[in-house]
Amino acid sequence: MMRVKAKKALGQHFLRDLSIAERIADTLSEHKALPVLEIGPGMGVLTQFLLRKGHDVRVIEIDGESVSYLREEFPELSDRIIEGDFLHYPLSELFPGGRQYCLIGNYPYNISSQIFFRLLDVREQIPCCSGMLQREVAMRLASPPGKKDYGILSVLLQLWYNIEYLFTVDASVFDPPPKVQSGVIRLTRNDRKELPCSEKALKTVVKTAFGQRRKTLRNSLRGILPAGFDRFDEPVFSKRPEQLSPDDFIALTLLLQQ
């Protein structure tokens, strides 16, 4: 049986612990009616449990060596193994007509944040996303307001998803072992259908505010304030960005658009 050599340039760290792989697969147990897209399956340690548990699985893998291994190891998946880059692949071709599906994966550390920005672009089709990533990033995504981990992605994802930090995974169960611990999270889409403000404006406010997170909003947002803005007496401007909830950022954006 062939094996795949982990490639540092692709951020590959292959999970060896089968019990952890099964626990990750179980994070989608309430969504078996929906197809699943696994990102970066590597040698299929998670894939095998998704299949055993009855999921309709598709996988997308950028590494040609891993793709060859998967096609040999999982012949029943041959037409559902996509060789490509999740960040740029036209996902509407896999799930046309707005079809709902779930995401899962042992996400490459070097692009984990980019994966979740891509999730935001296709969120209307994804009611649940779970998987493993660098613990620091996982904690950041799930962080509530007021914590040092709370940041841009925390706000933008929590606008649309409820995020749970499920458990920590030690570096020793990977080949090769990463230099940091990993964390498993689950995102479940909330009931929000649309925003009462411009989404583009909201993203600008959030990114600008956290770009100078030690400053109060009165100072950090000066560069994007509309001409003649005179509402600095509002209490929100004396706060720092990590003190604002996602809904607070919506209210702030509406205030700036008045």
UniProtKB/Swiss-Prot annotation:
Keywords: Cytoplasm, Methyltransferase, RNA-binding, rRNA processing, S-adenosyl-L-methionine, Transferase. It comes from the Bacteria. Belongs to the class I-like SAM-binding methyltransferase superfamily. rRNA adenine N(6)-methyltransferase family. RsmA subfamily. S-adenosyl-L-methionine binds at residues 13, 15, 40, 61, 85, 106. Specifically dimethylates two adjacent adenosines (A1518 and A1519) in the loop of a conserved hairpin near the 3'-end of 16S rRNA in the 30S particle. May play a critical role in biogenesis of 30S subunits. It is found in: Cytoplasm. One of its GO terms (cellular component) is cytosol. The gene is rsmA. It is an enzyme of class 2 (transferase). The keyword Hydrolase does not apply. InterPro entries: KsgA/Erm, rRNA_Ade_diMease-like_C, rRNA_Ade_Mease_Trfase_CS, rRNA_Ade_methylase_Trfase_N, rRNA_adenine_dimethylase, SAM-dependent_MTases_sf. Its EC number is 2.1.1.182. SMART domains: rADc (SM00650). This is Ribosomal RNA small subunit methyltransferase A.
